């Protein structure tokens, strides 16, 4: 039976002789023109350790597709290194790259009439970018994570890249000398793979496994281990079977499977960025999802894993302890997972997890027993109030002071804030406000890992609050609130805060409040004027024009023809 469900448009009939001529030049033989043509979206790049091992994985995917009787075609997609661009103008392009990746995969798959696609990515925006495209085009697809980095080691401690960011704050506070700073820098990132804690890349890969769009155990494998390459080849074979059975992404990415993914994000203590990305993925899949849904799930799912940034362990430790299947089985047994959701394997979640123990091994403490979780409820809270009428996102577990009321220290950019922290101008009890860093205002909604790490390094993590219309790295922890919406650039209340204003962040009440009267807020709003755009040409200008609020995922295709 012919398996070229879509590619027959470019391979069949007399009129397609020129098309076949070009395909012959890239290795097609007569027998290949009735096979499924499978794209391999290759995120290989030496820009970042996250992606530098992906080329070998793409080759294994190619081998798996050939073995399964289909025809592979490799194409490239881009990446930005969040870690390297952090704290610079370059970080404005990070969230933008999510859209570029999505658009590029959609463009190639539809432009070349591919029958399916295996997307291989590493750095943070590779995952949501690929899944947005997969949900849009709705052809058989599977996602392969490039793999996590192994921890670095120094002075008896495991290190991640966040250790280096925090060392900057420690050095500026006089807690370590330059030799110690350099030692951490030299040992933090020992090889290939994405940042090792439960930061954004590992959060999204774990969520995609829970979603059913990646193979079991694949999300926590180390990039440099043989099992990662073996899993990639197996993923390719599974995809070819999905093409034969026409198992489509929108049969897998449903409201219930997205709830499963969010539940796992809560259970592993994942990144705030997952909120933004799943809002966008849901939209691409035609699934209704809003911020309140995250809060509902947060209230019923415990944090089961002791993982960095706020915990002790990294993703490779989670893998040894049973990986995401162990976490999922615990949630399933306690009625917090939809077991009837389909996966890319052709089996349901319940079938995939059938042989997994109901409780984790007692010989490890990465995954806690159900009756002794890290926290009884999830950590990603949605805060609302007069400073964030559409909502804001915060990590609320593990903070020693769940309520902070203090004077506002207002900064118009991340750089100005970082300079003030390193100069010792921020004191215990202050509430830092970094604004005009939102999707439109940045533009690009930069991550604030540099200032938050500097706060931690300076010993102020438990006594200083930080709010922003920008984002936070998955490596961030402390009393920090991001994704404040509406953002400053569109006249949100964060634009109206004045130096010294009293602000309250209340994690218990999940509120974010500027402590001034409604009359004063109205007066300030009447006097507010929008700022001229920072960019008038190029991709940042286009992005600022098109991007929607963070409260709906900062997508760029919302109500396009009403703008």
Curated annotation (Swiss-Prot):
Positions with a binding annotation for Mg(2+): 82, 124-125, 447
Cofactor dependence: [2Fe-2S] cluster; Mg(2+)
Signal peptide: none
Swiss-Prot/TrEMBL keywords: 2Fe-2S, Amino-acid biosynthesis, Branched-chain amino acid biosynthesis, Iron, Iron-sulfur, Lyase, Magnesium, Metal-binding
Modified residues (N6-carboxylysine): 125
Gene3D superfamilies: IlvD/EDD C-terminal domain-like
Catalyzed reactions: (2R)-2,3-dihydroxy-3-methylbutanoate = 3-methyl-2-oxobutanoate + H2O; (2R,3R)-2,3-dihydroxy-3-methylpentanoate = (S)-3-methyl-2-oxopentanoate + H2O
Pathway annotation: Amino-acid biosynthesis; L-isoleucine biosynthesis; L-isoleucine from 2-oxobutanoate: step 3/4; Amino-acid biosynthesis; L-valine biosynthesis; L-valine from pyruvate: step 3/4
Residues that bind [2Fe-2S] cluster: 50, 123, 195
Cofactor note: Binds 1 [2Fe-2S] cluster per subunit. This cluster acts as a Lewis acid cofactor.
Top-level class of the enzyme under EC nomenclature: lyase
Enzyme Commission no: 4.2.1.9
SUPFAM superfamilies from the UniProt entry: IlvD/EDD N-terminal domain-like (SSF143975), LeuD/IlvD-like (SSF52016)
MF annotations from Gene Ontology: 2 iron, 2 sulfur cluster binding; dihydroxy-acid dehydratase activity; magnesium ion binding
Active site: residue positions: 473 (proton acceptor)
Biological processes per GO annotation: isoleucine biosynthetic process; L-valine biosynthetic process
Subunit structure comment from the entry: Homodimer.
Record function comment: Functions in the biosynthesis of branched-chain amino acids. Catalyzes the dehydration of (2R,3R)-2,3-dihydroxy-3-methylpentanoate (2,3-dihydroxy-3-methylvalerate) into 2-oxo-3-methylpentanoate (2-oxo-3-methylvalerate) and of (2R)-2,3-dihydroxy-3-methylbutanoate (2,3-dihydroxyisovalerate) into 2-oxo-3-methylbutanoate (2-oxoisovalerate), the penultimate precursor to L-isoleucine and L-valine, respectively.
Family: Belongs to the IlvD/Edd family.
Protein name per UniProt: Dihydroxy-acid dehydratase
UniProt source species: Nostoc sp. (strain PCC 7120 / SAG 25.82 / UTEX 2576)
Gene name of the encoded protein: ilvD
């Amino acid at each position: 039976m012919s398996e070229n469900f879509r590619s027959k448009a470019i391979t069949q009939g007399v009129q397609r002789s020129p098309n076949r001529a070009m395909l012959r030049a890239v290795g097609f033989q007569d027998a290949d023109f009735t096979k499924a043509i499978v794209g391999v979206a290759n995120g290989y790049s030496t820009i970042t350790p996250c992606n530098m091992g992906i080329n070998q994985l793409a080759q294994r995917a190619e081998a798996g597709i050939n073995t399964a009787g289909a025809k592979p075609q490799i194409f490239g997609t881009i990446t930005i290194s969040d870690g390297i661009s952090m704290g610079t103008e370059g970080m404005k392009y990070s969230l933008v790259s999510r859209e570029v990746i999505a658009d590029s995969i959609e463009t190639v798959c539809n432009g070349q009439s591919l029958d399916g696609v295996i997307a291989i990515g590493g750095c943070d925006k590779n995952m949501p970018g690929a899944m947005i495209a997969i949900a849009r085009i709705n052809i058989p697809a599977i996602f392969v994570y490039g793999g996590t980095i192994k921890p670095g080691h120094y002075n008896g401690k495991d290190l991640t890249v966040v250790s280096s960011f925090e060392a900057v704050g420690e050095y500026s506070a006089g807690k370590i000398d330059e030799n110690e700073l350099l030692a951490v820098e030299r040992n933090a990132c020992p090889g290939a793979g994405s940042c090792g804690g439960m930061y954004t890349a590992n959060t999204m890969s774990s969520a995609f496994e829970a979603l059913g769009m990646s193979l079991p155990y694949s999300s926590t494998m180390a990039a440099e281990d043989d099992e990662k390459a073996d899993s990639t080849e197996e993923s390719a074979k599974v995809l070819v079977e999905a093409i034969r059975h026409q198992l489509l992404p929108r049969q897998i990415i449903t409201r219930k499977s997205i709830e499963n993914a969010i539940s796992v994000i809560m259970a592993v203590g994942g990144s705030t960025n997952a909120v933004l990305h799943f809002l966008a993925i849901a939209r691409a899949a035609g699934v209704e999802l809003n911020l309140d849904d995250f809060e509902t799930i947060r209230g019923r799912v415990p944090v089961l894993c002791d993982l960095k940034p706020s915990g002790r362990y990294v993703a490779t430790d989670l893998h040894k302890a049973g990986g995401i299947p162990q976490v999922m089985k615990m949630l399933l047994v306690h009625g917090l997972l939809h077991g009837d959701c389909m996966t890319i394997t052709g089996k349901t979640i319940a079938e995939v997890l059938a042989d997994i123990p109901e409780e984790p091994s007692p010989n490890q403490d990465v995954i806690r027993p159900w009756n002794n979780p890290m926290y009884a409820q999830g950590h990603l809270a949605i805060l609302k109030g007069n400073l964030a009428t559409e909502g804001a996102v915060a990590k609320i577990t593990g903070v020693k002071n769940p309520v902070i009321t203090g004077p506002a220290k207002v900064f118009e950019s991340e750089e100005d804030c970082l300079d003030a922290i390193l100069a010792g101008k921020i004191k215990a009890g202050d509430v830092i406000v970094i604004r005009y860093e939102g999707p439109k205002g940045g533009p690009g909604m930069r991550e604030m890992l540099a200032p938050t790490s500097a706060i931690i390094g300076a010993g102020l993590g438990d006594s200083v609050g930080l709010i922003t219309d920008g984002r936070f790295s998955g490596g961030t922890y402390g009393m920090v609130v991001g994704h404040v919406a509406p953002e400053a650039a569109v006249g949100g209340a964060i634009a109206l805060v004045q130096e010294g204003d009293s602000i309250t962040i209340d994690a218990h009440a999940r509120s974010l409040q500027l402590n001034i009267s409604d009359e004063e807020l109205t007066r300030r709003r009447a006097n507010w004027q929008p700022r001229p755009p920072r960019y008038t040409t190029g991709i940042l200008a286009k992005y600022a024009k098109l991007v929607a609020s963070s409260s709906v995922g900062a997508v760029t295709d919302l109500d396009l023809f009403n703008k």
